[in-house]
């Protein structure tokens, strides 16, 4: 039979373990991948390989559909033949300007620009797809693929997918020699792009939620996307990190609660060890 001391200690450890398990389970449930698209990449006359990307069509349906349709070219325009015009090592690779090729052009399937859909997902790992912009609600066709965690972009750029296969090709692009304006010295082109078979139901991405509440949020039908015909700003770009930017990962409340449980367990253990023998009465030891 457990003594009271052992029972209290076991209960404390059990609560801590359950909290840790709950956090891990929540983190493991990522956004659903609804579509797969690909880019066949060339540099000069040399094939670099294929990048296969999964899109989060349940979480950001408008943004994912924009990228999917531009990858297939079904609207009469799209990514095929365009270049990666901006490459910054240990940050990201940027492309999608199929009208001017220098970061000042591009357009969405909804019109010139469309609003930020939501910021439910964080830039929590390398290999994530996110929209390049020139400020709030200025999404067009330009996108970037992260090559490191870029938490300072959370809440400013819309994450909508991830690299499923061919991250080695992303690394080849990232490590290419660049010149002025971070443009590759030798152009890197999307020679071919298109859509692949829809992945099995239940396939989940690896991007983390900005809030755990989003993981179980019921998906609602997408509202019509407002179209803006204003002239595009000078550049769709992505800001570099600043010293004040930080990403703590798990929600603060969960961290405090977990720490509190551990401290409580330690305090109980110390007090019970110091208690005089027989404190709990006969039959309890």
UniProtKB/Swiss-Prot annotation:
Signal peptide: 1-27
Example of a GO cellular component annotation carried by this entry: endoplasmic reticulum lumen
Natural source organism: Neurospora crassa (strain ATCC 24698 / 74-OR23-1A / CBS 708.71 / DSM 1257 / FGSC 987)
Annotated control of activity: Inhibited by cyclosporin A (CsA).
PANTHER family reported for this sequence: PEPTIDYL-PROLYL CIS-TRANS ISOMERASE, PEPTIDYL-PROLYL CIS-TRANS ISOMERASE D-RELATED
Transmembrane segments: 250-270
Name of the protein: Peptidyl-prolyl cis-trans isomerase B
Occurrences of domain PPIase cyclophilin-type (ranges): 38-195
Gene3D superfamilies for the chain: Cyclophilin-like
Similarity remark: Belongs to the cyclophilin-type PPIase family. PPIase B subfamily.
PROSITE patterns, sorted: CSA_PPIASE_1, CSA_PPIASE_2
Catalytic activity, reaction form: [protein]-peptidylproline (omega=180) = [protein]-peptidylproline (omega=0)
Function: PPIases accelerate the folding of proteins. It catalyzes the cis-trans isomerization of proline imidic peptide bonds in oligopeptides.
Entry's EC annotation: 5.2.1.8
């Amino acid at each position: 039979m457990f003594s009271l001391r052992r029972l209290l200690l076991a209960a404390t450890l059990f609560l801590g373990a359950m909290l840790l398990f709950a956090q891990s389970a929540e983190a493991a449930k990522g956004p659903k991948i609804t579509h797969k698209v690909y880019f066949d990449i060339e540099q000069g006359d040399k094939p670099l390989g294929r990048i296969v990307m999964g899109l989060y069509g349940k979480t950001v349906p408008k943004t994912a559909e924009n990228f999917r349709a531009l990858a297939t070219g079904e609207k009469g325009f799209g990514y095929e033949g365009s270049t990666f015009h901006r490459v910054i090592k240990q940050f990201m690779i940027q492309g999608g300007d199929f009208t001017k090729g220098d970061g000042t052009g591009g357009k969405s399937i909804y019109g010139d620009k469309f609003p930020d859909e939501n910021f439910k997902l964080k830039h929590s790992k390398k290999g994530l797809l996110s929209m390049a912009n020139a400020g709030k609600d200025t999404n067009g066709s330009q996108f970037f693929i992260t090559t490191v965690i870029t938490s300072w972009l959370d809440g400013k750029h819309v994450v909508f997918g991830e690299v499923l296969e061919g991250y080695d090709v992303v690394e080849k692009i990232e490590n290419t020699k660049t010149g002025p304006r971070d443009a590759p010295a030798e152009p890197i082109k999307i020679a071919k792009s298109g859509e692949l078979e829809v992945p099995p139901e239940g396939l989940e991405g690896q991007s983390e939620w900005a809030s755990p509440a989003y993981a179980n949020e019921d998906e609602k039908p997408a509202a019509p996307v407002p179209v803006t015909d204003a002239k595009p700003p000078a550049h769709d770009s992505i800001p570099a990190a600043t010293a004040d930017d930080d990403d703590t990962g798990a929600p603060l409340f969960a961290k405090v609660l977990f720490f509190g449980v551990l401290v409580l367990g330690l305090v109980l253990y110390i007090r019970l060890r110091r208690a005089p023998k027989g404190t709990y009465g006969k039959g309890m030891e």
